[in-house]
Amino acid sequence: MPELKDYGLVLRSREYREADRLVTLLTKNNGLVAGVARGVRKVHSKLAAQIEPLTFGLYQFHLGRSALGTLLQAEALNHHRKLRSNPLLLAHAQYCCELCEASLPEHEPAGPVFTLLLQALTTLEAETEPARAAHCFELNLLALLGYRPVLASCLCCGGPGPYRFDPSCGGIVCRRCPASAEAFPVSGAAVSVMKRFLELGFYRLSVCRVPVAQCGEIHRVSRLLFAKAVGKTRFKSLEVLHSLTEWH
């Protein structure tokens, strides 16, 4: 049977059977890969520390006939300890990971998403406002999935604002043009921030000020677009974020 060796980031690790763990990774060249790490819950397992969530490393799997592979070797290159030691940073990082897992099929290359996620984690490690980095990640992930919001001008007439965001057409519509019942007002400031996120990504993100009200608008846009993209709006990591802070 074939083997797979690739750089990857551990998105999730959970107990499986008596002594194993089920590990889900986003890899550089093979997309989502899930496999069983056998015996890692036993004392002195060499693999246990290599498969903690948010660990980046080089992983080798044996691919059998089932959907799950078997983890053979792992070499951790970055444990992202700063993220894991801070509950708020950890929750934001887990949210980014959960979005990736929900958005991608298994074993289909997703190199740009892999790169984006690593950039997000690196940015979060230096962030004083982690929600800002998470919202930037949301929008750029949507763009890679083919759901980039149209923000240049009114989708219907090309005119100026004030605007509403209409999830049914994936962009902004001025108040003079018809929109669906899902449409909601979005401020010019929020539109400007979203355009900046999409144009520059994480570059000099620390100098981009995003007030709480605008964070709420941006997350609402992203949440509704993710509902269209993956059919899901509820994420466990969001519940953790809400318990830690007034996250928008």
Task: State each model region's role.
Residues 1-248:
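Non-catalytic alpha-helical scaffolds and adjoining flexible linkers that form interface surfaces
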